[in-house]
Amino acid sequence: MALLNSNCPDLKLVARGKVRDLYEVDEKSLLFVATDRISAFDVIMKNSIPGKGKILTEISLFWFDLLKDVLPNHLITANFDEMPEKVQKYREQLEGRSILVKKMRVVPIEAIVRGYITGSGWSEYKKKGTICDIPLPNGLVESEKLPEVLFTPSTKAEIGDHDENIHPSKMVEILGDKKLADQIAQSAIALYTKASEYAASKGIIIADTKFEFGLDEDNNLVLVDEVLTPDSSRFWPANKYEAGRTQDSFDKQFLRNYLESINFDKNTSIELPQDVIENTLSKYKEAFQLLTGREVNL
């Protein structure tokens, strides 16, 4: 059963994001619910991808476990039997797509890491020879592996607004804390490096990804939100990779390409056709199976 919007009247709804609904459980914990909503170009589509939220949740849990030695994360439990009673009453709606997490002070930055030149980075490079105003060598081609992994942050926009790519020095201004900014950049690159090495062993190139961070009560940096999912990353099949062109992918790129092909108005939500829904879901399933070695159980 698809879930477009969760409905938990006995829990305090804190926010509805592009994909996740966020509830306060008590003064120290939150419930993250991954719905089946899908967005592209910062626009939420009118219909959903059934089961997508469960796949995203399972992939995030997989990465939280794999990367926990690089940086702690905000997870308390994803086992529904361990959730508080007031959450368990919504089992039918929420099980398999919810995680109970510690409350954190969220850092207002999208921590984007790029190993390959594609997407908005490729667009900027063609115009200016830079990504986030960071100069790059001449002569790079689309989808080429970058000379070194780049940390290219963006602002964290409100729903309906667009994230803005910024130079890392601008992040220092926004945070007002150079030490924290440096730690975020170093942690994001370390997380990406470990994840991309693992994914490569499974035949997947992680071209780029987006991390989000929070601070705990002792000001320790913590990994939060979703991690290395097909919503937040570009996953390419390694056996089909060829620099100089757009790549096949196991992620939202299929949807982005469809929307571009119909000259999508990036200010207006639309209803997606069934074949686009099915193709998008199959790509998410394939990413899950390749990364985890498990079958999807929707």
Describe each PLM feature range.
Residues 175-207:
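A long amphipathic alpha-helix within ATP-dependent nucleotide-binding catalytic cores
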Residues 69-74, 194-206, 219, 292-298:
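Surface-exposed helix-capping loop/turn segments at secondary-structure junctions
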Residues 113, 206-227:
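Conserved metal-phosphate-binding beta-hairpin within the catalytic cores
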Residues 41, 122-123, 218, 232-234:
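Intrinsically disordered, low-complexity acidic/polar segments
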Residues 1-157, 266-271, 275-298:
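Active-site loop/lid in soluble adenylation, ligation, and acyl-transfer enzymes
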Residues 127-131, 136-180, 223, 227-291:
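Anionic ligand-binding catalytic core segments
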Residues 29, 106-108, 203-206, 218-221:
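Coil-to-beta-strand transition motifs
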